[in-house]
Amino acid sequence: MSKGAVLIISGPSGCGKSTLTKSLIESIPNVYFSISTTTRPMREGETDGVHYHFVSKEHFLQDIHNNVFLEWAEVHTNFYGTSLKPVQQALEQDKIVLFDVDVQGHHSIKEYFGDFAKSVFITTKNKDILRERLISRQTDDLQTIEFRLIQAHNEMQHIHNFDYLIINDDITTAKEAMVAIARSLKYQQIERLSKIIQKW
């Protein structure tokens, strides 16, 4: 895997992943955002093929059978997956492939790419702030929000498996940190090449 780079973003619902992802794509033109496939209902303001590829459960299960996905998982009773072929094509074009996945997806992608993939865990300063953000989104009922907070607590136990941590308490600072991490990936590539030359 000599071309491109892989950056994985994970974090609890409501931490600001979508905002930071959009900002990164706007700041670095060579970023390819891997659009996940999902069986969950489309939310207001979302577009098929832009935010997600929305499919039926039957379609998703058939894709699993056909080994379409690099990784897939069932989250909050819905299925999410990452198609492998477009990722491979983007890497061949020397792009930075950006993933926005849950902790389980992070582990699967890391297992596939190894040290070639770098990862960022994004979270809020504390659980109360996360709860406020989830409520302000007005996309979930209170029961779902409490369930998401439990999931967030579980996800926080995996922080040590990530290369970077961003506490998103100031959106401007968080955006700058994301861009700096993404730009550093090319330097890490040079470091890998240097090691190869030394061995040669």
Curated annotation (Swiss-Prot):
Q: Where in the cell is it found?
A: Cytoplasm
Q: Which residues bind ATP?
A: 11-18
Function description: Essential for recycling GMP and indirectly, cGMP.
User: Which E.C. number(s) belong to this protein?
Assistant: 2.7.4.8
Return the InterPro entries for the record.
GK/Ca_channel_bsu, Guanylate_kin-like_dom, Guanylate_kinase, Guanylate_kinase_CS, P-loop_NTPase
Q: Which family does it belong to?
A: Belongs to the guanylate kinase family.
GO CC annotations on file: cytosol
Q: Which organism is it from?
A: Helicobacter hepaticus (strain ATCC 51449 / 3B1)
- Catalytic activity reported: GMP + ATP = GDP + ADP
Alphabetized Gene3D superfamilies for the sequence: Guanylate Kinase phosphate binding domain, P-loop containing nucleotide triphosphate hydrolases
The molecular function terms in GO held by this entry are: ATP binding; guanylate kinase activity
Residue ranges crossing the lipid bilayer per the database entry: none
Q: Where is the Guanylate kinase-like domain?
A: 4-183
Where is this chain primarily localised?
cytoplasm
CDD domains in the record, alphabetically? GMPK (cd00071)
- What is the name of this protein? Guanylate kinase
Keywords in alphabetical order, please.
ATP-binding, Cytoplasm, Kinase, Nucleotide-binding, Transferase
